[in-house]
Amino acid sequence: MLKKITLILTLLCMLVLTATGANRRFTLVIDPGHGGHDAGALGAISKEKNINLSVALQFGKYVERNMPDVRVIYTRKTDVFIPLKERANIANRANADLFISVHTNALPAGKIARGFETYTLGMHRAKDNLDVAMRENSVISMEKGYQQTYQGFDPRSSESYIIFEFIQGKNMERSVELARNIQRKVCSGANRPDKGVHQAGFLVLRETSMPSCLIELGFITTADEERLLNDASRVDDIARGIYEGFAQYRNKYDKSISVPYRAADTESVPVAKIVSDTKQEKDERRAEEADTAPRRTVKQVETRATKAKTVQQNRRQNQQDKPAQQ
């Protein structure tokens, strides 16, 4: 009897777990970098924190509209400060499937660069990669007691980054694939210079327990790049590219998808509006033709009547002239 009860309970547990897994929504965490008193990099006309938030929210809109089955979580949706560790904790508590952090690059005064690049967690292969990681990680110095929180990690010391050389794990391969998808789609779709996919020691990525990547949208310290990153149309192009890179990744790895997701509808010009405008234009043309057709007919009739009247007058005049000539 005890064996039967145990078997029944085991089967019930399996059914519950299966149902839970089947009903579980794919969870994406979008992380707009910086915020609040942490402005991030500064440009001549804007702050990094605002650019990051603008692109992140637009990217999220594409996901929410085209993938309603995806649960989208933002680490922030307003101008507030969120510690790096808490950003990762938000993703870990939600048992997220993917973590994408959105940032904007910068260079010291006098240097110019352009382009879009994507990072995954790992040991930097070049000094430029280390510089980017150091700049992004320096935000922890704004957190109270950060030495204890991050176990003595010093974002300004290159020695602290040696630990990233030994970080591997099951998430590495998928993170790199996600980064490559996003890099390819944004650079081709938004016509951005391709600065490639790199690895570097980002604390926010180290603390997450799922595949993740960090995006650098462009260089806020380069004048034309900053203008581009503040242009609503270009922001939409970039957000759409990020979405399409994410969709390509999900089509491959989310086994619950029966029909692959296609490219997103354009945010700025909805498809329904295009169809509606076309129909309206056709109706207007038909109405115009209907109005102008009678006028052309009347004019033709008037012209014919005038010609006939002129012919009759000429005939009468000829008849009157004949006796005089005789």
Predicted segments with their positions:
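Active-site-adjacent mobile loop/cap segments within catalytic or ligand-binding domains
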Residues: 40, 159-261
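Bacterial N-terminal signal peptides
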Residues: 6-16
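Hydrophobic alpha-helical membrane context
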Residues: 15-16, 43, 115, 228
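Catalytic-core regions of hydrolytic enzymes
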Residues: 21-153, 168-172, 176-180, 236, ...
